[in-house]
Amino acid sequence: MFVLPRYRLSSRLRECDDAPLLLYYKGNADLNRTHVINMVGTRHCTEYGKDICRRFVDELATLCPDVLVVSGLAYGIDIHSHRAALDNGLDTVGVLAHGLDQIYPRLHRDTAIQMTSQGGLLTEFMSRTNADKVNFVRRNRIVAGMADAPSWWNRPKRAAH
């Protein structure tokens, strides 16, 4: 595990007004890649949404094999984009809403372990910090701040534009 002070954060994230002062990081991915895409969407994705997500990452791996895929390790589009990236040999970083000493949801533990050697896990929360509703909102600003543009997949109808 590394502690990344503000000056070592990804250059994109440092430009955000509300960038965290430090991040805890476990992994090997370069957070300052030329190409970084975030993939976020509903936790209750459809089969069509999963398929489109998979096909997009398959194509992305061919066109831009050095891209870093960033998401939140949550149910739905998040976990499907992480797994698609791993399956295509792409690095993927999961931004957590809790400390690095736990994985939430537990069902994603095996994927998270694989990500530490093919990407990484990143959080602003100290160990023993539990997943809490407000932490997910704080996590989302990091996911958004790490990429050049947001990427919404299978967005729920009630999501903000």
Annotated model-derived regions:
Residues 3-161:
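Glycine-biased, small-residue-rich flexible motifs in mid-sequence functional cores and linkers
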